[in-house]
Amino acid sequence: MNKVLIVDDHLVVREGLKLLIETNDQYTIIGEAENGKVAVRLADELEPDIILMDLYMPEMSGLEAIKQIKEKHDTPIIILTTYNEDHLMIEGIELGAKGYLLKDTSSETLFHTMDAAIRGNVLLQPDILKRLQEIQFERMKKQRNETQLTEKEVIVLKAIAKGLKSKAIAFDLGVSERTVKSRLTSIYNKLGANSRTEAVTIAMQKGILTIDN
């Protein structure tokens, strides 16, 4: 039988979860905590097989509790909250939570998520999974935009690859040498380079420049 630790600052929620979980003979309640600080202590003392964790609580939040518990234990933790804010979902999953459930979820979904967590899997509700995928896509898109060189920066990079110095590049482009150096700094930052040679090498590896350029 799997030992469950319930963490929530509302007594009525803890009592309701206890009554629900006791209907499943695969689980037994071994403890309950009213905040993250108590949860961290009980995780050490009781060594539960799974933890149901609220997020917003006094003294210590659920996210901080997850972080501290995960530093010492591999106990699967399922977030059970009323909040579906993007940053909470992301941070919770990144900290190692095996699930993110809203408190209006069905008992069937709760038990399925707990069963999956016990097996070491992450099971997310379709709407939450979809939102996390959208967030990941937005992150990747933003990252691509942040690292993508502008047309003017590519022109400078091509000139550098030909061995031209900043002064010569500035003359050819009809801009100031200061502008060229500014674009070069931007190129370094976007490519993670520390020198002209490294910038050209990375650009060729990424396909931004080719030998024909």
Curated annotation (Swiss-Prot):
Localization: Cytoplasm
Pfam families assigned to the protein according to its UniProt record, in alphabetical order: GerE, Response_reg
InterPro entries attached to this UniProt entry: CheY-like_superfamily, Sig_transdc_resp-reg_C-effctor, Sig_transdc_resp-reg_receiver, Tscrpt_reg_LuxR_C, WalR-like
Domain HTH luxR-type span(s) in chain numbering: 142-207
Principal subcellular localization: cytoplasm
Transmembrane segments: none
PTM annotation, UniProt: Phosphorylated by YdfH.
4-aspartylphosphate, modified sites: 54
All copies of domain Response regulatory, residue ranges: 3-118
Keywords: Cytoplasm, DNA-binding, Phosphoprotein, Transcription, Transcription regulation, Two-component regulatory system
An MF annotation (GO) of this entry: DNA binding
Chain residues forming the annotated DNA-binding region: 166-185
Keyword Nucleus attributed: no
GO CC terms: cytoplasm
GO biological process, one term: phosphorelay signal transduction system
Database matches in PANTHER family: TRANSCRIPTIONAL REGULATORY PROTEIN YDFI (PTHR43214:SF37), TWO-COMPONENT RESPONSE REGULATOR (PTHR43214)
Function: Member of the two-component regulatory system YdfH/YdfI. Regulates the transcription of ydfJ by binding to its promoter region.
Protein name: Transcriptional regulatory protein YdfI
Organism listed in the record: Bacillus subtilis (strain 168)
Gene coding for it: ydfI
